[in-house]
Curated annotation (Swiss-Prot):
Superkingdom of this protein's organism: Eukaryota
This protein's name: Uncharacterized 16.5 kDa protein in psaC-atpA intergenic region
Keywords: Chloroplast, Plastid
Any one Gene Ontology cellular component term annotated for this protein: chloroplast
Subcellular compartments: Plastid, Chloroplast
Organism, scientific name: Chlorella vulgaris
Amino acid sequence: MENATVPNDQNEDYIDLTKPMSKSYWKKMKVKGFYRWVLVRDFKKINDILNTNEIVPILVSGAKTFTKSRFSAMRWSLNEFAFVDGFFFLLLFFFYKKKKRSKISNTSKRKKRTKKKRTRNLGNLCFLRKNLASILFF
């Protein structure tokens, strides 16, 4: 009966499925200059699969549907972890907005000036294109 459970040192592919796959906990971390709640997972149980001891963060601040208690209560398999990583990365990528600084007004004026110049250049380009088209086709 002692040989029924093989330790990780002898067999690399062995995973004890009775124990939870990973520990997860919440931590306040600095992300892109702002402090946010981050779900941190420690992959010590599946070290043989991933070959890493790194702490892998998921940024959940952008998602309103996943609350702390609901997310930490869930049990995830490896594939679902990867899916969730990708999902929240996409959420952050599309919905992350930088804070606007209202103190500096000179930059906004500069931006407006550059925009005007760009539109003028675009107008000139369109005019040139029309001329080229008329020369080529007529």
